[in-house]
């Protein structure tokens, strides 16, 4: 950790189509090797597929999916007297959304559909309906925290 001043968070400019900064941040998670236009095509394509399939506002579905994936607690390793304990800690809001986005992209890439836009759309729809790989990951993280509840007095 820096001993000097805390570096200010940089604001992400909102995306051009929907005007959502959360969506712009998500595009940055989808982006590989700085190819932002490709990431934009993928995300917008996925949102088009979502709106086509569900006949709902795609941004609403996106935020619903993120809400269903966002973890509330996670475990952190803490070394106490030669033993390492998995200590459950609450996840702060910024990290919560970052983890949700990361998991959404990760489990989208592992899906079997043909294009990345289709994979992402499928994972978004599944996450909005509380199923799919990313939601399972969140449940695993919560289960891990619940199992290690006894060590919660080892605060950081």
UniProtKB/Swiss-Prot annotation:
Keyword set includes Ribonucleoprotein: yes
Keywords in alphabetical order: Ribonucleoprotein, Ribosomal protein, RNA-binding, rRNA-binding, tRNA-binding
Keyword Phosphoprotein included in the entry's annotation: no
Gene Ontology molecular functions: rRNA binding; structural constituent of ribosome; tRNA binding
UniProt xrefs under SUPFAM superfamilies: Ribosomal protein S7 (SSF47973)
Pfam families xrefs: Ribosomal_S7
InterPro entries: Ribosomal_uS7, Ribosomal_uS7_bac/org-type, Ribosomal_uS7_CS, Ribosomal_uS7_dom, Ribosomal_uS7_dom_sf
S-S bridge residues: none
GO cellular component, one term: small ribosomal subunit
GO aspect biological process, one term: translation
Function: One of the primary rRNA binding proteins, it binds directly to 16S rRNA where it nucleates assembly of the head domain of the 30S subunit. Is located at the subunit interface close to the decoding center, probably blocks exit of the E-site tRNA.
Sequence similarity: Belongs to the universal ribosomal protein uS7 family.
Listed NCBIfam families: rpsG_bact
Complex formation: Part of the 30S ribosomal subunit. Contacts proteins S9 and S11.
The protein, known as: Small ribosomal subunit protein uS7
Gene source species: Saccharophagus degradans (strain 2-40 / ATCC 43961 / DSM 17024)
Gene: rpsG
